[in-house]
Amino acid sequence: MERLLAQLCGSSAAWPLPLWEGDTTGHCFTQLVLSALPHALLAVLSACYLGTPRSPDYILPCSPGWRLRLAASFLLSVFPLLDLLPVALPPGAGPGPIGLEVLAGCVAAVAWISHSLALWVLAHSPHGHSRGPLALALVALLPAPALVLTVLWHCQRGTLLPPLLPGPMARLCLLILQLAALLAYALGWAAPGGPREPWAQEPLLPEDQEPEVAEDGESWLSRFSYAWLAPLLARGACGELRQPQDICRLPHRLQPTYLARVFQAHWQEGARLWRALYGAFGRCYLALGLLKLVGTMLGFSGPLLLSLLVGFLEEGQEPLSHGLLYALGLAGGAVLGAVLQNQYGYEVYKVTLQARGAVLNILYCKALQLGPSRPPTGEALNLLGTDSERLLNFAGSFHEAWGLPLQLAITLYLLYQQVGVAFVGGLILALLLVPVNKVIATRIMASNQEMLQHKDARVKLVTELLSGIRVIKFCGWEQALGARVEACRARELGRLRVIKYLDAACVYLWAALPVVISIVIFITYVLMGHQLTATKVFTALALVRMLILPLNNFPWVINGLLEAKVSLDRIQLFLDLPNHNPQAYYSPDPPAEPSTVLELHGALFSWDPVGTSLETFISHLEVKKGMLVGIVGKVGCGKSSLLAAIAGELHRLRGHVAVRGLSKGFGLATQEPWIQFATIRDNILFGKTFDAQLYKEVLEACALNDDLSILPAGDQTEVGEKGVTLSGGQRARIALARAVYQEKELYLLDDPLAAVDADVANHLLHRCILGMLSYTTRLLCTHRTEYLERADAVLLMEAGRLIRAGPPSEILPLVQAVPKAWAENGQESDSATAQSVQNPEKTKEGLEEEQSTSGRLLQEESKKEGAVALHVYQAYWKAVGQGLALAILFSLLLMQATRNAADWWLSHWISQLKAENSSQEAQPSTSPASMGLFSPQLLLFSPGNLYIPVFPLPKAAPNGSSDIRFYLTVYATIAGVNSLCTLLRAVLFAAGTLQAAATLHRRLLHRVLMAPVTFFNATPTGRILNRFSSDVACADDSLPFILNILLANAAGLLGLLAVLGSGLPWLLLLLPPLSIMYYHVQRHYRASSRELRRLGSLTLSPLYSHLADTLAGLSVLRATGATYRFEEENLRLLELNQRCQFATSATMQWLDIRLQLMGAAVVSAIAGIALVQHQQGLANPGLVGLSLSYALSLTGLLSGLVSSFTQTEAMLVSVERLEEYTCDLPQEPQGQPLQLGTGWLTQGGVEFQDVVLAYRPGLPNALDGVTFCVQPGEKLGIVGRTGSGKSSLLLVLFRLLEPSSGRVLLDGVDTSQLELAQLRSQLAIIPQEPFLFSGTVRENLDPQGLHKDRALWQALKQCHLSEVITSMGGLDGELGEGGRSLSLGQRQLLCLARALLTDAKILCIDEATASVDQKTDQLLQQTICKRFANKTVLTIAHRLNTILNSDRVLVLQAGRVVELDSPATLRNQPHSLFQQLLQSSQQGVPASLGGP
């Protein structure tokens, strides 16, 4: 290289590149270093901007500043070429050799041409509104010093003195023109960048609203440096990342719509998921293996070049060019390796996000297509959350699976080069652990599968618990069902405990392995007769650490692959479930008769594909257009199953089903109304265009106008999830209104009249079913047979069979009717009836929640801002346990101290050997350059005489073999202690994180169970489930993993600083400025990282809720043809979550590249200084080598510490969210336990004293001064119109809501003074909506396990369920999720049986028999009267016969008691409200009274 430089510069080989010539810099140095290099950089940088996309207004002229810069750049590209012409002119035109001038001139010309093109592109891009990239302008000005120095050189050479030669004068003039052009360029950049001319085209969106698109259209430099993240990070630093919309939009290739299209091209039903993922994204992913390969190779360049550089400094005989190459190679390798590894991680995560978008979308699409055999909601949510994430961990593990063995092979070869075959002993020891690792991995995989099953069970149980939280609180089952959840959690933690301790064993084996292998290698080497030297020892130690790196990581890689395989199998099982297939289910041809809408012939249906459940058989059914067909029968006879079969929600085992106009769908109103968490209007429109006239007619037909008039915001009022803020009647009517508004030709109505009072039922029948729907075909299931007298036909079902069909006059007499005596006492009066329906006074009882006047119930999920608070760290510390946490820290410090001690002892040993072998050199002990610094690049050189021991060292024995035995014994002893400390630390850490996982979940569950019902009404289930699923999973696994890395990095840094401080104190001077730089970078990153993590969790909850909502309303979605709209909504929610995930990953890579480049800069600076000192004869090779090795280790540790700390903080957001519920969730006032004994309620007297209840300040009172007294054993019926306050009485009695004033007494005891459990244990309720959970019949009947089987069977017989339960397998028969094995009526009967088991003195019945037939209802009323003859019974009336036998009737109106007397007395009082209700109910027999 010296010869080449000498020829190019025309200088001597001894000094090829002189820095000074006279009073100015050397011309060759100026042209090469100050001109050619900056111009080359300008050319490369400009080329990076050539791909910038143009704005839509690119044809418009740019601003004056841009035009001036373009002109100056063009001139600067021409002047260097003109400058070459005088070079050929004699005499002495050129100041240097022709080759040098041509090289410098051509590089400058190419650079400015490239820059001119880049400026043209930027001027017509979005950058044209500003001055453009600052870096580009600054680099363009870098050649200015070279021009100035060249002018000075000409002046010193006398170019301006006579005789004036044309060649030099021409060149000097061109130089001055170039300086002028460069000055013009600077002025052009300084000019304001905009605005555009007034006639410029305006963007479609205002500039402040135009969304940014991440990465797309950015230059190469911006992509490599992540400069495009600057606006996002600036918003994060200012605290402006408050919602997902504040994050830049996804690149095109990450958009969920694009991913869905690409994936669907490779996906077909029944295909293997991994094949489809490979077809869609696999090729791009495999191509990234090249980056991984190059990065792995570059990992070995650092230690090799470092060794060569130290050798160059030690020998001092190699030419300078070699040193320059080593230094440049070291710096270039560090920079290139950092960029490649960073880009590899970034691109891999982008592929992971692509696969994630595709998997989550296909899971949701599959959920929309599921047939009747569908998994529980909790299991589906686990697939969406846990399993999908574990599956996608494959992307980070696959390339490591081949990259680590490659590293292993190369390291083994280098180790062989150092110690020969002695390395085999250590290798054998390492390989012996491979089968051990295989056994551990197998156990981990098996335990993982079991853990996921237990997690499914837990999440499913929590889902059911949340759906039935009202009944749970009514019955006081929080503790019992909480114990069931804890039992599932205990089984889950049992498997997690096995996994964690196996992981701890794995970590211990591989962490202790380096020292053990080192001992084996050194003993073998000595026994083979070789002499240990410092070079051999430290080189071998470094290579052993490089050997351990792949072996240490390999178990984690295998574990990740195994976890991905487990989750892949679970997702594949879900995707393989049979689909809902209308093409195969229905006949392809419509019914033969044009007037026939529906035809079933020989059709056999079942809820499962093999027909093991109750079957529904229809021999023949033909329904003509416009008919009203009633369906009647006993409870559980198959009425709802018949409608589900027509809707395609059952398995058709055989037969023929033909529907005319199938593509138009059905109007479906299910028995359990499905209501979305949205406004009432949105629920009714259900995605259809708003038609004011039609909407008005639907509201009138469904009797919703009066209800809307009392709601806070009318039809814009938001209702809770599943409509919990509405009464049962309101939910039923909104669901019916939704079906009617869709304007279908065939309607399937499953008992929509069951939950409404008589007035509303008559209104729905005449205005809706016989009114708006009169021109449609209707199938109506109902137990209220009086409303079927005007039906065209009635179907009688029994045991799943259609046994009779005919006109109402033939079929209805076969159905047991209510004795007409009930109707004889009521005299119909048209005037009274008319009076009863006018101006009903209502309150807001139907909306039992805290709503603002705007009607908004669902509030945005709260999100913390700023740094994770100190109390979150304290909460996790306390969850681990203070004693255990201190023990973990102590064992960690002890482990690091013994590791440092082992390396220190080894350095002392080698120092003594060198002293004996080189007595002429009195050298102190060598530096412990192998100080366990977690860096594979350490000490491939002999550190020399740089370490001065702090402690006095023992003198070596004179005998050489005794020395070896002595040193090896001490070394092995220290290593053994280190091994025990490592084991102790691994076990303690596993135990601590397990303790924290158990504690956090237990506190969360307890706090949620103790929350008031208002919290559950205003909070989507998915939001709560996100805590129990994703956040708990993070606290279980992800947080301990990254926290372990953080603690290891922190301990390693402390050990390193201790060594630096004792052995080379001056090196610590570099630490403060380095720490300041690192601090500012990580602080800038952390501000955004925290918010992005929070937004990621925030946007995950709607995905959970949307899937749960979809599964709950699947039949309605498919019947109305709304699946496409819901799929689009899922893509929208997924896009918001993917934004957060992508931005989180990109900001992590932004931090990583800066930390790595700063480390490379430190290494490069030390290497450059070393070369300068070497030229001056001042370099100390050992000092330089030690500095470089420690610089490599120090920067790596600081980078790892910053990265792991920020990731730990991000993971702690999950703990923060758990703590938010644990600490901030409102709790029910528990009261104080009174010393009353277990049987304190002996009589059953109830007294309300001036009770006032308002759901929130500012709303009318739901109960307004209610006062009444119920005597012990009295039967009290409670009636009133919708919203009169009936259900509020029960809420106050059970203290689900606390009254504003007044009190409730039970046997003279104020309920507000009682503990909740003490109160509710003495009360019983039969709820309107039955609550069952997954489990056996026994567990559902007796959740607390208080009764024997004989009592359970007796209660079932009294409720006429014994035969059904026997057919299901007895008391141990499984009911399925939500008790779906039973019909709705059977579920209500099971809840009644549950109440029959109670010993409570007070029973509350909330319209408990609305979904059973009249005959069963009569039998049940007799059972209730007999079983609770001596107890106080409060009955909210729904059917007249349930309260006419009561001792007294309480009539409520607008939250006040207006009447209270016996039924006979009130009936005979003229103009009484009870008589009006009674008379209005007589329009049908039997009459009915108010809804909830």
From Swiss-Prot:
Any one Gene Ontology molecular-function term assigned to this protein's record: ATPase-coupled transmembrane transporter activity
Binding site for ATP 1: G633, K634, V635, G636, C637, G638, K639, S640
GO CC annotation terms, alphabetical: basal plasma membrane; basolateral plasma membrane; lysosomal membrane; membrane; plasma membrane
Compartment list: Cell membrane; Basolateral cell membrane; Basal cell membrane
EC numbers: 7.6.2.2, 7.6.2.3
Name of this protein: ATP-binding cassette sub-family C member 10
Polar residues bias (residue ranges): 826-840
UniProt source species: Homo sapiens
Domain ABC transmembrane type-1: 285-563, 885-1210
Phosphothreonine found at: T463
UniProt cross-references to Pfam families, sorted A to Z: ABC_membrane, ABC_tran
Family, as annotated: Belongs to the ABC transporter superfamily. ABCC family. Conjugate transporter (TC 3.A.1.208) subfamily.
Lineage of the organism: Eukaryota, Metazoa, Chordata, Craniata, Vertebrata
Role this protein plays: ATP-dependent transporter of the ATP-binding cassette (ABC) family that actively extrudes physiological compounds, and xenobiotics from cells. Lipophilic anion transporter that mediates ATP-dependent transport of glucuronide conjugates such as estradiol-17-beta-o-glucuronide and GSH conjugates such as leukotriene C4 (LTC4). May contribute to regulate the transport of organic compounds in testes across the blood-testis-barrier. Mediates multidrug resistance (MDR) in cancer cells by preventing the intracellular accumulation of certain antitumor drugs, such as, docetaxel and paclitaxel.
The keyword Hydrolase belongs to this UniProt entry's keyword annotation: no
Reaction catalyzed: ATP + H2O + xenobioticSide 1 = ADP + phosphate + xenobioticSide 2; an S-substituted glutathione(in) + ATP + H2O = an S-substituted glutathione(out) + ADP + phosphate + H(+); 17beta-estradiol 17-O-(beta-D-glucuronate)(in) + ATP + H2O = 17beta-estradiol 17-O-(beta-D-glucuronate)(out) + ADP + phosphate + H(+); leukotriene C4(in) + ATP + H2O = leukotriene C4(out) + ADP + phosphate + H(+)
Coarse class of the protein's main subcellular location: membrane
Topology relative to the membrane: Multi-pass membrane protein
Record-annotated membrane-spanning stretches: 32-52, 70-90, 102-122, 133-153, 172-192, 293-313, 320-340, 391-411, 414-434, 507-527, 538-558, 875-895, 933-953, 974-994, 1051-1071, 1153-1173, 1182-1202
Entry-linked InterPro entries: AAA+_ATPase (IPR003593), ABC1_TM_dom (IPR011527), ABC1_TM_sf (IPR036640), ABC_transporter-like_ATP-bd (IPR003439), ABC_transporter-like_CS (IPR017871), ABC_transporter_C-like (IPR050173), P-loop_NTPase (IPR027417)
